[in-house]
Amino acid sequence: MLHVSGWSRLASASKITFPVLALSAALAVPALAAGVKTITAVMHSDLRVIDPGLTTAYITRDHGYMVYDTLLATDSNFKVQPQMADWKVSDDKLTYTFTLRDGLKWHDGAPVTAEDCVASLQRWGKKDGMGQKLMDFVASLEATDAKTITLNLKEPYGLVLESIGKPSSLVPFMMPKRIAETPPDKAIPEQIGSGPFKFVQAEFQPGVKAVYEKNKDYVPRKEPPSWTSGGKVVKVDRVEWITMADAQTAVNALQSGDIDFMENPSFDLLPLLAANKDMKVETLNKLGFQTLGRMNFLYPPFDNVKIRRAAFLAMSQKPVLDALVGNPEYYKVCGAVFVCGTPLATEAGSESLTKGNGMAEAKKELAASGYDGTPVVVMAPGDVVTLKAQPIVAAQLLREAGFKVDVQATDWQTVVGRRASQKPPKEGGWNMFFTNWVGADVMNPVANVSISGKGKNGGWFGWPDDPKMEQMRDAFSRSSSPDEQKKIAADIQKQVFDQVIYIPLGQYFAPSVWRKSLTGVLDGPATPIFWNIDKSE
């Protein structure tokens, strides 16, 4: 779901008193042995949910990478690599055999077994979109001995490895069997993984502070790190995540050395930070985020494809990105449904979005569509920096095209609840909302749940009922040819634009900043990751 990046605008001096007190509380730590090397980080959001199979929230995914490990992982060339296991595929492409590597232990000291991993995959496969699709093709999944997992398919499926090695939410993290058998809609009772860090439950303050210590029993792979693959070598003793919702307080703490790393400073503070010789500013997630508009297909006016097309033609990415980000260094006008910079990227059919030249045609289309003036109810959260601009700019463009628009100011958590409502807009429903996906979550037709055509039968909010889309997604899933997959993906993009399944409004990039006393900070599609980072005094 939403990656809530950025921080609130600068508060007045009278409002900074409480964050300073909160900072003092968060930074208060138990007495540590001399020489304990600690990284203190302010993440993009506070951590409350610590079950990485329960929510797609990116802060929970990031927590997952600290504590847990994966069977497979994706490198910077979009290739799936062995992580906890390597694999073999039968000649008929129906049997995948995974063999666990040596030296794998859970944090409680027990060995990792194939039974643990089977249970973990089964739990993940009930909740994750790619996991559900994979399980539709699975005939059997079993542990054939302590180190061997055998997956048998009903028919060839082209995304077995990509599903198990997916880098972002929901990540198929491995857990002990007793924990993985927790129903997927209930929180797991323990934080026991096999990953490079151990979670310090005793110091966890939900929404305030999370602490991780180096897992001294972890055996890294020999390969160099690349995205979420390769050797996860931990070079510090301890990592602390603390919450500071006030931007200026966090920046002050970074400049004074009270914290070492800030994941997502607001764009207006970047020049100040970049000018500091002790700071390094860099975009770690090179795929960035896709921001998008979503319509409700169940009710007028957007139950009419002609009216949806008029709205699509009225949209323009540049004014949205200018209002959202401001500095073109940190955004990209990009019409690719599967985001620019990925193997499936194409901008075919997106000219009106990327060039902003569709308004005249939008007015003609709307006039010919039978639009009767039904107001477009747009949900506009005002509490999230990366979601404030989109509804305001979109409403202006819709009005220019001839739509009547009702912008309803709210907060993001209300949007999260209200967008699940299938009631009419007059009864608390909605017509349009906006959100952001990290690039890794939308870079292929199976991962990208926004293009689902399942309607009310398991589709994403907005509920387009599009059997043709589902047929094409299944065809993509069955294909193992990159060329064929690329052609199918291009056809899917055409269908997205023809039916206006959703409206891509561009790509933006959220830089991180850290003190130069940190070295070895890695990039990737699911950042930040804290292995490989060292800290000097």
Regions from the PLM with identified roles:
Residues 34, 99, 133-205:
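Surface-exposed binding/hinge segments that line
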Residues 42-92, 119-122, 192:
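N-terminal lobe/hinge region of extracytoplasmic solute-binding protein
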Residues 51, 298, 302-342, 389-390, ...:
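Periplasmic-binding protein-like
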Residues 92, 107, 152-171, 192-246, ...:
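Aromatic-rich, solvent-exposed beta-strand/loop patch
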Residues 197, 329-368, 382-389:
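Structural transition elements
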Residues 204, 512-537:
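Long beta-strand-rich cores associated with HINT superfamily self-processing modules
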Residues 206-208, 246-247, 265-267, 331, ...:
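Ligand/substrate-recognition segments at binding pockets and active sites
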Residues 355, 406-417, 445-516, 537:
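Extracytoplasmic/peripheral linker and loop segments enriched in polar/acidic and small residues
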